């Protein structure tokens, strides 16, 4: 395998990048010159050295505590529970949410050998017991694994003095009804709100 094929193969192993996209990236790096390629290689090579989970929420950070957990202006009574660190970036990108986060580190997926004991659920319970939390928002993906995880956490937390909510799911803004699947339509109907 030559050098270009090796780079294409490496990029195509990344999620969401197929062979054609990987080839475009490889040829773009060649066209840009060695400085850009070196900058990318250095950034990737130091990723695991510099980035680690926040000791409070589990999101990725370069510091012991991430910038969200360290921000005293955030709503400390609300915790948004997500499956993965990248979900923190997605939700924190909207100004409507100013609370804290808790990363589970995955979702319950028995077929993949992932059960509740592999997730950071006990840490969530500890954070609630430490006090000050009044609402837990379950923001796991609207998939079988995400729903299973949310239901499990809801059952575990139901006797604790917190409100447990789940993100609404339904039709996307600008979406056409004819393209919606049956489950999405059912959830949209069941979760309808007064207008």
From Swiss-Prot:
Gene designation: recR
GO molecular function: DNA binding; zinc ion binding
Coiled coil: none
Biological processes per GO annotation: DNA recombination; DNA repair
Source organism phylogeny: Bacteria, Pseudomonadati, Spirochaetota, Spirochaetia, Spirochaetales
Protein name as it appears in the record: Recombination protein RecR
Superkingdom, taxonomy of origin: Bacteria
UniProt KW Isomerase keyword: no
InterPro entries according to UniProt: DNA_Rcmb_RecR, Rcmb_RecR, Rcmb_RecR_Znf, TOPRIM_dom, TOPRIM_RecR
Positions annotated as zinc finger (C4-type): 54-69
Alphabetical UniProt keywords: DNA damage, DNA recombination, DNA repair, Metal-binding, Zinc, Zinc-finger
Family, similarity comment: Belongs to the RecR family.
The keyword DNA repair is assigned to this record: yes
Function of the molecule: May play a role in DNA repair. It seems to be involved in an RecBC-independent recombinational process of DNA repair. It may act with RecF and RecO.
Residue ranges constituting the Toprim domain according to the UniProt record: 77-172
């Amino acid at each position: 395998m030559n050098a270009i094929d090796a780079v294409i193969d490496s990029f195509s192993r990344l999620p969401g990048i197929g062979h054609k996209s990987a080839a475009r990236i490889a040829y773009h790096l060649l066209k840009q010159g060695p400085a850009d390629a070196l900058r990318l290689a250095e950034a990737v090579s130091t990723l695991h050295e510099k980035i680690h989970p926040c000791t409070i929420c589990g999101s990725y950070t370069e510091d012991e505590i991430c910038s969200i957990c360290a921000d005293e202006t955030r709503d400390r009574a609300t915790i948004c529970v997500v499956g993965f660190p990248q979900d923190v970036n997605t939700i924190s990108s909207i100004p409507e949410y100013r609370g804290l986060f808790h990363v589970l580190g995955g979702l319950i997926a028995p077929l993949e050998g992932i059960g509740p004991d592999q997730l950071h659920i006990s840490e969530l319970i500890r954070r609630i017991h430490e006090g000050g939390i009044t609402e837990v928002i379950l923001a796991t993906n609207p998939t079988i694994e995400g729903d299973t995880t949310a239901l499990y956490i809801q059952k575990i937390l139901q006797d604790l003095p917190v409100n447990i909510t789940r993100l609404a799911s339904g039709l996307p803004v600008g979406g056409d009804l004819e393209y919606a699947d049956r489950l999405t339509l059912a959830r949209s109907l069941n979760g309808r709100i007064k207008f």
